[in-house]
Amino acid sequence: MKIERLNGGDFLIAPTENSWESAGTSNSGAVMLPSTPELLALISRAAGQDLTKDKRLQEYVVICLYSAVGVMPGNDIRTQRRGLAIFSPRLELCYRHPLPVLSPDFSPDSIDLKGIEDARVTYTDGKFFIWYCGYNGKRGVPCCAWSEDLIHWVKQNPLAGPLGEHENKDHVIFPEPFQGRWWMLHRPWGYEIPDANNYVIRLGSAPTPYGPWQDEGEILRGIAHPDKKISWVGGGAAPLKIADGKYFVLYHNGAFSHDDYRWYEACTCLVDLNNFIPGQPENIVSHRLEPFMAPATEEETNQNKRISIIFPMHAHVYEGKLYFLYGAGDKATCGACVDWQEVKDIMDF
């Protein structure tokens, strides 16, 4: 399978000299929406400039809430904020906002003091949702926030329901409800459920996107490799709908080698919610492909941290190609594309 790294493999969103985004711009979520006059007007208001005439945005708009690590003038707390970038459906960067659009709460007991981390993006009922791990320097809990204009946000820290009561990460919801409920992929640890410390992907559900979210059980765990000391899995991009209740899922596999070098690669599977049986949620997973894409470039390797990373955060299909954004080397955001039919042929769906 031939995967093309966009922009010659270079970063699509790189750190800048702005102090709030100077230390890293990795793991950036996004959502692609059809271009409408209302949406183009909305992003133009958010940008403070007219984007309605940009020919690259006439069919679809990709709205990215990117990771931005650094400090703000007058605030010496190094943390992770969210910046705003607008891409074309081919992942051409069309606009990048000069200031963060979402920042942590800096009160002493804040859940997200040290970071709004690994934020996936979805859109429903006229609202943009981001699903992120709120990190306070000691523990990370699942959170979300929503906005109608990409500038003003309402936070729910932590998620409502049992899933928000314990440490949890890499959570993202499916794009629409199925059989009267909303569904979520999540990965808890330190949780009062069997084998949670093995970092497995589990299924959650709720009556609304606002919760209350409950756990439905394990659906996917890492595959043991003889050359790795430990392996695990975690969520990636928001699932892509391919049929009623059936989704293409791009997730990540992580591992430590025996000399403690860390490795992340992109993987794929299919999830069919039609097959969900309470108490047997693993029946929904099939057609697993590991790896789908592995680190291979300088951008995807970070020798200072002894880590190589491809961390998928967004995916969409446009003009017969699967496009996706990923965190590269724990440094910045990259993009890639691959023939969608080839993916379907290899995964046999």
Feature map (PLM): residue ranges:
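Short glycine-rich, acidic/polar surface loops and turns
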Residues: 299-302, 310-314
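Beta-rich carbohydrate-recognition and catalytic domains
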Residues: 1-114, 122-168, 176-231, 241-305, ...
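Beta-rich, blade/repeat-based domains predominating
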Residues: 119-120, 171-174, 236-238, 311-317
